[in-house]
Amino acid sequence: MDKFRMLFQHFQSSSESVMNGICLLLAAVTVKLYSSFDFNCPCLVHYNALYGLGLLLTPPLALFLCGLLANRQSVVMVEEWRRPAGHRRKDPGIIRYMCSSVLQRALAAPLVWILLALLDGKCFVCAFSSSVDPEKFLDFANMTPSQVQLFLAKVPCKEDELVRDSPARKAVSRYLRCLSQAIGWSVTLLLIIAAFLARCLRPCFDQTVFLQRRYWSNYVDLEQKLFDETCCEHARDFAHRCVLHFFASMRSELQARGLRRGNAGRRLELPAVPEPPEGLDSGSGKAHLRAISSREQVDRLLSTWYSSKPPLDLAASPGLCGGGLSHRAPTLALGTRLSQHTDV
């Protein structure tokens, strides 16, 4: 049980692990979808290629889009690309690294579908049965061109009366299936060789740029996630204070109207609504959340965060972004331990 808990915490704390898990899940779903798909070629001259190529390419496109939607870093990458520069310069290398990472994970499921379709051969036979050169097969010598086209269109349908138990149909189908499997295994081998070379040759080169881009791409993702969590915490605290303020104002209104008398005619004192002390949680890093206490301040803070990200320098002087909003991190006292989950 402890091992499962540690594994779950690892997936929670690592965005790359989550994205890799989603990538593997999409690949497994792709295999299941293809194995359960009912393939029915129309066996018509002008529709075989459309059906076969559509089945070969359309599901991979849908899986590619699903991979982009499931990957949170795709949205973070676009936001980093389109954000105003503000006080933080934009590094094209980080954006390229994030784009490469997103595309690699999004292309996994489409490649699985295409390779399965090529190794199975049904889509390829349906798509290219009408494009086979009849001169490669001796059985078409006594047929007219129209008969040859009709016969080739019926090749994927082995139960059709025109091609049932026909040696020519078996020869054409076997030829196309072998060609499809050869292409599938060639693509698989090329992908394995490319992955092997990338994995083995990468340590031979300078890793400085790679480590820097990987670090800052993770930073951009974690920064946005922590900002969202901090906004949620501030919204909760702000709502709590607004509710307390509402009850306090209602108490004052009840006092003004003289509605505090009990049934016996004596005056009843309403208990005071406790106001949140200003110094509450000052040592836990939450005191800075209470400085933003109006809708105008919240709107300005969010606008400033989008239009002018703070510089990546914690030693910079506060108030760089204008408006008196300081983006300087609160200083931690010596001996303070940082928990595994950041307190935001």
Curated annotation (Swiss-Prot):
InterPro entries: CALHM (IPR029569)
Localization per record: Basolateral cell membrane
Region (Central pore): 9-36
GO biological-process terms attached to the record: ATP export; ATP transport; protein heterooligomerization; sensory perception of taste
Assembly behavior: Associates with CALHM1 as a pore-forming subunit in a hetero-hexameric channel complex.
Sequence similarity: Belongs to the CALHM family.
Protein name stated in the entry: Calcium homeostasis modulator protein 3
Native organism: Homo sapiens
